[in-house]
A protein has these predicted regions:
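Polytopic membrane enzymes that build or remodel cell-surface glycoconjugates and lipids
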Residues: 1-456, 468, 475, 479, ...
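Canonical positions in the second alpha-helix
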Residues: 398, 431-432, 465-466, 499-500, ...
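TPR/Sel1-like alpha-solenoid repeat signature
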Residues: 409-416, 428, 442-456, 462, ...
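Terminal, low-structured helical/coil segments at or just beyond the last alpha-helical repeat
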Residues: 588, 593-632
Length: 632
């Protein structure tokens, strides 16, 4: 049986901290230069709520809905500390992804350090504790949590989970109230970071059993854990959070368990999107075999708890950590590699603990096998980290592991579209639609491609198809509104934008576009109100100030127009239309040199800005100057 050890800091702690920090930096060095990918784009890059603490506070007041478009369960999550960590990084680093990645690496390193300290406290030898933590830090399956900025919620929750366990161990030794307070705070913080924090209480019970604690202290800690869990669930309910809807896939839970174990041991192919791995069509024989295997593992834990305590503790940790993610609790994505982050620590402890008890030649053989496995894992991790540096490579490699993922096909389409390869983008959008005919995002994006190519009939048909599938999708209405506006069907555009806003009242893009439609219809008062409303919804939206300035200029209110255009540039110094409209303003007020300067700035930012080019050429022809320097 494991026993708590008196808390004394030693040189080994400092040396491990230094060595493990260097190890994590070496393993993940290639990810530092990676850009925002996958959910990072929406959750960080385009998330105005991270710009201030006041706006970020909304995540403490309300849960965030989510759904995975393929085999998802829907639901919502309540993770305010995760969002606050992103807001802090946004304030420190702006939109420099390197800073966000540095935070992720620091969290992973701290978790390895805390795991080392916890094992030492439980009288696991320094060598074994260091080996377990170093190996755990280098597992390739953790690349999703560490390299993906949005995967931080789990590593942040685990930081507090391990802190809670260290506080619990301290309380078992000392009975100090401050230790109990630290335990409660860490438990709550873990839950507010990610739902994986719910594991803190069962892990505490495992610690109490392993430490053979005094009954009274056992009751105090477990009771406090229950109170914290209840408080979190109540707060989550008040914020509108709820578990994913759907039927738990308990029948396939055994198969899911062994899939997770396989990913941890031999992640030959890895994927950022594992929703299609949820076992739904296994044969009865395979399902029964998986359950029998889990049952045999539980029996082995009971048999080994006295002879091989580290092995038994590691396997028990593994089972507890995986249980919620094996279909027992409905999860929006079903399965994911990041859900192994906690469980893998138990698996490594069991492997290293077993090796330490082997004798003679079997120990040497086991050691060689362990070295080979760890070395292969480091090589595999390096290859996977390189995938994270390139968005297309990340999705393509993930698709090899999960070829039936319509989400990955869609993301590949987006990546190729952003890279300017419209033909490949169309192919992947169509493949996503073929797999999931109700995938409205892919249908809309394919419509966008056809619209950009001038194929308006196909584009309109796709937008209408998306609306027919989901009339409550505001994006579909916005996109068909944009098409109508491009075709000068201004009344139809107005109706489409109004439908979008009715579904999503804070859709700034739809509100601004409604203003443009109203302006074309001659309703200048309505257009001005729309632009003002957009500014009220998002005061940082440069395009709203710019469009309002252009409208005021059209009305002859030059002073007010200039103020709005200057505000647009204050919010986005690289917004070319604001310079263009300032050029038009200066041209209108008889300041040709200033007009030329503004048109040139617009072209410096956007060389293919044809309206700016034609205005510049006209002004320079009038003043006798040359446009040579402005040609792309």
């Amino acid at each position: 049986m494991l026993r708590p050890l008196a808390g004394v800091a030693s040189d080994s702690d400092l040396w491990f901290a230094i060595i493990s920090a260097c190890w994590v930096a070496l393993l993940y060095r290639h990810v530092i230069g990676a850009a925002f990918v996958y959910d990072d784009v929406a959750q960080i890059q385009h998330n105005a709520a991270l710009l201030s603490w006041h706006s970020a506070a909304q995540y403490a007041r309300a849960a965030v809905p989510f759904n995975s478009e393929f085999r998802g369960f829907g639901g919502s999550f309540y993770r305010p500390l995760f969002w606050f960590s992103l807001a802090l990084d946004r304030r420190l680093w702006g939109l420099n992804a390197t800073g966000f990645h540095f935070t992720n690496l620091a969290l992973h390193w701290l978790n390895g350090l805390l795991a080392f300290l916890l094992l030492k406290k439980l009288r696991v030898s320094v060598v074994l504790s260091a080996a377990v933590s170093i190996i755990w830090l280098s597992l390739p399956i953790h690349s999703e949590v560490v390299a993906w900025i949005s995967g931080r919620s789990i590593s942040l929750a685990v930081l507090f989970l391990l802190t809670a366990l260290l506080s619990a161990e301290w309380y078992l030794r000392s009975s100090k109230i401050v230790a109990l307070l630290g335990y409660a705070i860490a438990c709550f913080a873990s839950l507010l970071s990610h739902e994986v924090g719910i594991l803190t209480l069962p892990m505490t019970c495992l610690l109490l059993y392993a430490a053979n604690s005094v009954r009274r202290r056992w009751l105090v800690l477990s009771g406090l854990g229950l109170v914290v869990d209840a408080l979190y669930l109540w707060l989550r309910h008040l914020a509108g959070g709820h578990l994913s809807s759907g039927i738990p896939v308990i029948v396939g839970s055994g198969t899911s368990f062994w899939k997770y174990v396989g990913w941890m041991l031999l992640p030959l192919r890895m994927s950022i999107e594992r929703s299609t791995d949820v076992p739904t069509d296994n044969s009865p024989m395979m399902t029964a075999a998986a359950f029998i295997g889990v049952l045999a593992l539980l029996i082995a834990i009971l048999q080994l708890r006295s002879k091989l305590p580290e092995v038994a503790a590691g396997l028990a940790w593994l089972c507890i950590a995986l249980a919620p993610f094996c279909g027992i609790v409905p999860i929006y994505q079903g399965m994911a590699e990041r859900y192994t982050y906690v469980a893998a620590l138990g698996l490594v402890l069991a492997i290293v603990g077993l090796l330490s008890h082997l004798k003679s030649w079997t120990r040497s053989l086991g050691l060689y096998a362990l070295i080979f496995w760890v070395s292969w894992g480091v090589w595999r991790l390096n290859a996977r980290v390189l995938d994270w540096r390139d968005e297309i490579s990340l999705y393509a490699k993930s698709l090899e592991a999960t070829p039936k993922s319509s989400v990955l096909l869609y993301n590949l389409g987006v990546a190729f579209a952003e890279a300017g390869d419209a033909s490949k983008a169309a192919v992947y959008y169509q493949r996503a639609i073929d797999l999931n005919p109700r995938y409205t995002s892919a249908i809309i994006n394919l419509g966008n491609l056809f619209q950009s190519q001038g194929n308006y009939s196909k584009s309109a048909a796709l937008y209408k198809r998306a609306i027919a599938l989901d009339p409550r999708d505001p994006d579909a209405w916005v996109n068909i509104g944009n098409l109508y506006l491009q075709l000068a069907l201004n009344q139809q555009a107005k109706v489409a934008y109004e439908n979008a806003i009715a579904l999503k009242s804070n859709d700034v893009e739809a509100i601004i576009d409604l203003g443009a439609a109203l302006q074309r219809l001659g309703d200048l008062s309505g257009a001005e109100q729309a632009y003002q409303r957009a500014i009220a919804v998002d005061p940082s939206q440069a395009s709203a100030y710019c469009d309002l300035g252009a409208l005021l200029l059209q009305e002859g209110n030059v002073g007010a127009a200039r103020e709005e255009l200057i505000k647009a540039l204050e919010h986005n110094l690289s917004y070319a239309p604001a310079y263009f409209n300032l050029g038009a303003l200066y041209e209108q007020t008889g300041s040709p040199s200033l007009a030329i300067e503004m048109y040139k700035k617009a072209l410096d930012i956007q060389p293919d800005y044809q309206h700016a080019r034609s205005n510049l050429e006209r002004m320079e022809a009038r003043t006798g100057t040359s446009t040579a320097k402005t040609r792309p």
